[in-house]
Amino acid sequence: MSSLSKKLIQVALIASLAFAGSATAQNPAKSWVQYSAPEEAGFSSEKLQSVLDLYDKNGATALMVVYDGNVLVWKGDIARRYDTHSMRKSLVSALYGIYSGNGAIDIHKTLKQLGIDDSVKLSEEERSAEIQDLLKARSGVYIPAAGEAKSMKDYRPARGSHPPNTFFYYNNWDFNVLGVIFQMETGKDLFEALNASLAKPLDMEDFRPMDGRFWRDSTLQTVYPKYDIKMSARDLARFGTLYCNGGMWDGHQLLSKEWISETFTPYSTVDHGSYHESYGYLWWIQLLDDSIPMYSAQGWGGHILVVVPKYKLVVVKRHDTFSGSGGDSQIGTYIRTILSARTLETVSRPRLIPLEVRPEQQQFIEMPEADLRKYQQQFYMNGRTRKIEYGKYGLVFDEWFVLHPVSDSRFYAEDLRKYVSFRWENQKPVFDRIE
């Protein structure tokens, strides 16, 4: 038996016991509260400073550490909606759990049964892959996909080299097609469903359906678009707490225990040299010090959401990847640093205080809808066509960023936190630059 096979068995055995005997964390309040003194929750304030030092050194821009449903420590722009990058996959995994639980989706359906094909025609063997194989990144379909990283292209296996459910390959084709299948099978918009089935039940404060978008790569022979999702650190912390509680929220089993168990089953193990990690249903699985199961959603640039049920712990770290500023994930380092601050001396009813997040200090002007509509246009930037359109949320840039008028030639792009400038030609505003 190979060392990877042994590791997979070890992870599976330990992960299967992760929720056994673990006390369920409290649900967060409708608005986040924090411990008045971490000591009352069994943590040293002095030692938790090391977590903030790590945050600063790591170049992160938002951090939330939640213990037993309440905020233990936080820093940065926790209300700012950042691109989740690959963390979006874990959100979609949850939607599959909800909608397979209510019978709308059968994860054993094959691509052939679903009528799934692509511009590059799939073989009969490829079309025998089931939805659950895509959730595991084990479809056996190895063709170009929208939004691929260079490493995905470099390590893509040859077509036909592995039958479905026999080989792990972190595959954007699988992930992209899952977004389309969800809409086909449920008849619901992916992002509206995320809002109705997760954001609202979990009392998320910042997410809106417009924070999701599909985009296509016209240079590739594929009909399936990539999907992007923006979400704040404080909303992701609620999502993580749902999993920390075994799918239970406010007395309701939002995700079945069976789905949680299947999600956190290690179907594949990846050897990164200095460490191993496994993959479940669009979640990563690690063992801290070979004994403590941790589950994580990870996004390019150092974005992480980590769930440690044994310690009722949820950690979210974000980076301003909109500006190209990322960092290392450092999952193990963060968790070890937090756990090293434990004192085990608690009080029965720790004092809680509201978590106060200061809103952005920006001055905007009022502008009538008719005037805002004048700014609608298309232009070419950074290799692709961009749009400014008017809709439900007002004037929106790139289908994702609400534009707030500062003057008749300058708008502030929410979340992106940059200014979009226009010049006037023949009494019409024309896009000029972003700064």
What is each stretch, according to the model?
Residues 27-42, 46-53, 84, 88, ...:
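Active-site-proximal loop and beta-strand segments within enzyme catalytic domains
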Residues 47-78, 305-306, 312-316:
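A short, well-structured edge-of-sheet supersecondary motif
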